[in-house]
From Swiss-Prot:
Protein name per the record: 3-phosphoshikimate 1-carboxyvinyltransferase
Species of origin: Chloroflexus aggregans (strain MD-66 / DSM 9485)
GO molecular function: 3-phosphoshikimate 1-carboxyvinyltransferase activity
Assigned EC number: 2.5.1.19
Residues annotated as binding 3-phosphoshikimate: K22, S23, R27, S168, Q170, D319, K346
Family: Belongs to the EPSP synthase family.
Active site per database record: D319
Subcellular location: Cytoplasm
């Protein structure tokens, strides 16, 4: 399927089981691979990115069974049990796989090479390579380690203190995983205000890690604090649910329910923004599942107004900005997005590609160095031909826009959704009603 053409339906209704959370699915594989014992993972996200993590740990000697598409049994080999791969470790399109594995492999007594597809090989890696080198890691790559392939010769790693300069969960996680192999405690400060699934999972596995608002300290494991396999049900992904939240809010006749979604406070920025814009949102049945807060989210047709998305909100919704930009285009008034320069290091330069797509839909939008200014107006979207550029979140954001655009909207390269939401197009068709 090289393109898909959509028109606006009269009504949206449905209860949508969104895929398992992408971040937690990755970590369930990578952390259990180096734990002791076997872990049973259910509601795993079988998207291309998470399957890259599975393929890589298998190449490193870990046995991973997959009885069903969304179920894994991971037989951990312990902190010292990984084996040198005889081939390049192919991370596909997955920056999470590459960066978290860079942390783990930096402390192994063998040589590894991490690479991926053309998109991943073009994305900046010095943000993780630099801090790992500061811990003593021996990593080389193109552009002095800023581009994959990355060659890693395992070495003795040092603990100490490191100040993070960007709020990146991937960088933070890579350092924490490297610290499992360090000669002393690692303390992280600075921009630690990104999603915290790694910290939660390590603690649940028995690792000695302390977290405060401005510091994270991990102590290298002893025999008593080495990670133990953690079985879990992966909660629904809020970054995937956000497409349905926005769809319901901007459509004139909609009610969509997304049950069992992760409501970890580091991941609920999109809900906070939509509420600030006036969206009618109801959260029911909040509960703890494992170490994560989960709930059922109901969103109904709403009258939205412009807002500002900036500062500490950004790390809590960085992946949802493409679809929040669609919400902003349908709101009354101006929406300002700033402090989001991290968007330029995603699968595409999402500041440029989102602004170009909105402009094609008839929206007045001004891209800036770290975000954009969107002039919103209800009922202003006009169908157009939009490119995903192989970026899964762009493809889905443009599909949401098509639900309220006049005329036909054609999306080129819609198959990009396989990265994080393989069933997206089937779900989109199922919730549309033309009564």
């Amino acid at each position: 399927m090289t393109e898909i053409t959509l028109t606006a339906p009269k009504r949206l209704r449905g209860v949508i089981q969104v895929p398992g959370d992408k971040s937690i699915s990755h970590r369930s594989v990578l952390l259990n691979a180096i734990a002791t014992g076997s872990a049973h993972i259910t509601n795993f996200l079988p998207g291309a990115d998470c399957l890259s993590s599975v393929a890589c740990v298998r190449s490193l000697g870990v046995t991973v069974e997959q009885p069903h598409e969304r179920e894994l049994i991971i037989h951990g080999v312990g902190l010292g049990g990984l084996r040198e791969s005889t081939d390049v470790l192919d991370c596909g399109n997955s920056g999470t796989t590459l960066r978290l594995l860079a942390g783990i492999l930096s402390g192994q007594p063998f040589f590894s090479v991490l690479s991926g597809d053309s998109s991943l090989r073009s994305r900046p890696q010095r943000r993780v390579v630099g801090p790992l080198r500061a811990m003593g890691a021996q990593i080389d790559g193109r552009a002095d380690g800023d581009r994959a392939p990355l060659a890693i010769r395992g070495s003795t790693l040092r603990g100490g203190q490191y100040e993070l300069t960007i709020a990146s969960a991937q960088v933070k996680s890579a350092l924490l995983l490297a610290a499992l192999y360090a000669d002393g405690p690692l303390t992280l400060g600075g921009r630690i205000d990104s999603r915290d699934h790694t910290e939660r999972m390590l603690a649940a596995m028995g690792v000695e890690i302390t977290v405060s608002p401005d510091r994270i300290t991990l102590h290298p494991p002893t025999a008593a604090t080495a990670p133990v396999a953690l079985s879990l049900r992966v909660p629904g992904d809020p970054s995937s649910a956000a497409f349905w939240w926005v769809a319901a809010a901007i459509h004139p006749d909609a009610e969509l329910v997304t049950p069992g979604v992760c409501l970890n406070p580091t991941r609920t920025g999109a809900l906070d923004v939509l509420r600030a814009m006036g969206a009618e949102i109801e959260i029911m049945n909040e509960r703890l599942e494992g170490s994560e807060l989960v709930g059922d989210v109901v969103v109904r047709s709403s009258v939205l107004r412009g807002t500002t998305i900036a500062g500490s909100l950004i790390p809590r919704l960085i992946d949802e900005i493409p679809v929040l930009a669609v919400a902003a285009a349908c709101a009354d008034g101006e929406t300002v997005i700033r402090d989001a320069q991290e968007l330029r290091a995603k699968e595409t330069d999402r500041i440029t590609t989102v602004a170009a797509g909105l402009s094609a839909l008839g929206v007045t939008v001004e891209p800036t160095i770290d975000g954009m200014v969107i002039t919103g107006k209800p009922d202003q979207l006009t169908g157009a031909t939009l490119h995903s550029y192989h970026d899964h979140r762009l493809a889905m954001a443009w599909a949401v826009a098509a639900l309220v655009a006049r005329g036909e909207t054609t999306i080129v390269e819609p198959a990009a959704v396989v990265i994080s939401y393989p069933d997206f197009w089937q779900t989109l068709a199922a919730i549309q009603e033309d009564v």
